[in-house]
A protein has these predicted regions:
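Anionic-ligand binding patches
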Residues: 9-163
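A short beta-strand-loop structural module common to alpha/beta enzyme folds
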Residues: 1-4
Length: 163
């Protein structure tokens, strides 16, 4: 969806990620039939109360990875299901801890280009998987689509998922 994903740092991260997810769904709904089911999501990384979105440059990616190195942070995914004019949004949270990263590892990872389109400058499902020393919560939240929560939201709307 073509929306402004800018987040207000003065507002709670949970509120902002939910807002962006819901705005994405509403933007798509304009081109859909009312009975269509629209699923949207937005993911952010939060450390020390600071929202880390997608890096703006390689230098920004390096800055983010240095900030996350050896520390615990939280990934939040806002998930919205919209159909029949009814919208529901939930925020799923997962705690992640990175081991200490070397400058060489960070530079090599950024050089792959992989972190450039990912919140917090890393993809847990890719090369950055070797950075994760601990995960507390939903792995799929970190990937950007918490499928267990999505399935529950769809079931509440009468949509059968796997029987």
């Amino acid at each position: 969806a073509d929306i402004d994903e800018h987040m207000d740092p003065s507002l709670p991260p949970e509120q902002e990620v939910a807002r962006v997810s819901a705005e994405k769904a509403r933007a798509v709904a304009k081109d859909c039939a009312e009975e269509d089911i629209i699923i949207s999501a937005d993911t952010i990384v939060v450390i020390d109360g600071q929202i880390l979105g997608k890096p703006k440059s390689e230098a920004d990616a390096i800055r983010m990875l240095n900030l996350l190195s050896g520390r615990r942070h939280e990934v939040m995914t806002g998930l919205t299901v919209l159909s029949g004019g009814q919208s529901q949004t939930q925020v799923v949270r997962t705690g992640i801890e990175f081991r200490r990263l070397t400058d060489r590892e960070i530079d090599a990872y950024v050089a792959t280009g992989e972190p450039m389109d990912k919140a917090g400058a890393y993809g847990i499902q890719g090369r950055a998987s070797i950075f994760v020393s601990h995960l507390d919560g939903d792995y799929f939240c970190v990937m950007g689509l918490p499928v267990c929560t999505l399935t529950q939201m769809l079931r509440e709307r009468g949509v059968t998922v796997l029987g």
